[in-house]
Amino acid sequence: MNRRNSLAGLAMMVAALCAACGSPPKERFYTLAPSPGAATAAAASAQPRTSVAIGPVRVPDALDRPQMVVREGANRVEILEQQRWAGSLRSEIGRALVDGVGARLPDAQVSAAESQAARSAAYRVAIDVERFDATLNDSVSIQALWTIRQDDGAQLASGRYSASEPTGPGAYDAIAAAYGRTLAGMSGVIADALRSAPIVSSAGK
């Protein structure tokens, strides 16, 4: 009887180990836009005098994927299957910029270019991401071209934004947070350029 019980117990242990080995690693999802704060709420409650559409956002083909990509050397990158963006990288960057620019321009309605609200936008901000690099436990860096146009296509301003942020410890959460800080800086640059632009009311279109 004891031998039978031992064999049965061993079989259960083996089955449990096999089940554990067969379980796929858990996927984790990250966002580049922080939770809405007081500044964003204040911007949303103000009466808009003009409107801004953020987008389109273009990213390099190698990064246009749901997985987080980290650099492993000068010529090698790793695609992390279990570390993923909550949406497409383009939409995550766009949403972070919508939130960041909107928080800094309380008198403007800021929305994503593909949204219904953006159809009558007085200004459009195109983003062309040239670099979006991360090194685990080190830093992230971005470089992007931005261009502001009026609704008639006339270019008002453009520039190239470059920034890097240390990640420190914290692995992938720290990478997402550092990217968020770089995009917050870019939001400030774009907002400053929009403040200098002549005010065009979307209501009069």
Task: Report residues per predicted region.
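Bacterial N-terminal signal peptides that target proteins for export
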Residues: 1-10
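Bacterial signal peptide processing site
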Residues: 22-25
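Short secondary-structure boundary motifs at beta->alpha junctions and helix caps
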Residues: 76-84, 153-192
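N-terminal segment of the mature soluble domain
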Residues: 49-117
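Amphipathic beta-strand/beta-sheet edge segments enriched in Tyr/Trp
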Residues: 135-165
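A short, hydrophobic beta-strand-centered structural micro-motif
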Residues: 52-55, 115-135
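C-terminal motif of bacterial Sec signal peptides marking the signal peptidase cleavage site
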Residues: 17-20
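Post-signal peptide N-terminal segment of mature Sec-exported envelope proteins
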Residues: 29-53
